[in-house]
Amino acid sequence: MTDHDLTLTDDPTANRQALEQLLTTATGGTLRLPAGTFTLDRGVVLGSGWTLRGAAHGDGPVTTWLTSSSPDGEPVVHVLGSRVTIQDIGFLPPPCAPGEHGGDRGTAITIGNYLYPAETEWIEDVQIRRVEVERRDERAANCVAVMGAVRDITISDVSIVGGCTGVAVHWGAVGDGVDSIVGPSYHPHHLSIRDLRVSDAFEGFYLSSVHDVVVDRVHLSDVEIGFRLLPGDNTDRFHSGGDNPVGARIRVSGAHVGWNGPLYAVRIAGWGRSEIDQTVRVLEYRDVVVRDCTFVPLPLARAGTGDPQRSRSPIVVEQASGVILEAIRVDLRVDPTATGPRHDDQAEVPAHQPAGQR
């Protein structure tokens, strides 16, 4: 693999073309970006075998920042290949309002896709390390999205300020739209999220219709919702994973959540209502554990949003049999500076289990 040192300027079109010239003509390697803040006129796609790396910054904050001037809602970086690494880069995504089913749009980084025109190959072995995302005062679009046919993904030491959901992990499927899915469906798995920090966002992270996932050492502060474990609106209706059932082998540990929304810090739901025919299905969770977590209710971020007839709940569980809650702490002292709980260094992503082409 070849290393490439890129020169970027204040010309958004030239910057994007410099990246694309290498990404479309070479067969992989490392693209090293200089320190500074650089604008692209639209997002770029990373295919297989590429590392996108910012300038060295020691133990301090990142010194390379990318943004986009595009109003079209594509990710700043869209990963559509395997063996990809993105590290030591900050992202400033432009404002975007992708709508209820546009969770993979308007992001800093999206890995994979939500909807596919036909059966697809898996994207695997992707690492996101030492990345920062800022979209202050803007909560309509997600920051990092992991979608569909993706597996063996590592997200570590990521810091996010603002946005809708910090890290959104969502199933995908073959279909023209959410109400016309024909399957098969694809469910992210063998995913590790560690040392994630999200603040001033609507939500820290969610996992929708996944299996074999470890989340450890996360600090979510000033968020309306901490995190959600969801079955997906079609649960496993279009899934044919054999020994890899959806909703199996999920660990969330070492989470500190300071939430300022009117409802809950955490929601764990087993039921989903299909957008295709409105039928309700219930997913059976297997070997799912949430442990060693602390939840701190903060004053409401928006006055008047709470229902005086309905109390705020640290955890809401809805038809989610098979889930274990262990060593859960609720801190009513309202101290957002408190350190997180002890973490679980023994939690590991299970060994790869082939899911086959679904």
Predicted features by range, described:
Residues 40-43, 61-63, 69-75, 95-102, ...:
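Short glycine/acidic-rich loop motifs that flank beta-strands on beta-rich extracellular proteins
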Residues 49-55, 82-93, 121-135, 150-164, ...:
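Right-handed parallel beta-helix
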Residues 15, 19, 141-142, 277, ...:
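Leucine-rich repeat
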Residues 4-12, 168-183:
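Glycine-rich phosphate-binding "P-loop"
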Residues 20-27, 38-53, 61-88, 92-123, ...:
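Extracellular beta-strand-rich solenoid/capping regions of secreted or surface-exposed proteins
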Residues 3-32:
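Acidic Gly/Asp/Thr-rich repetitive segments characteristic of extracellular carbohydrate-active
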Residues 310-358:
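Leucine-rich solenoid repeat scaffolds
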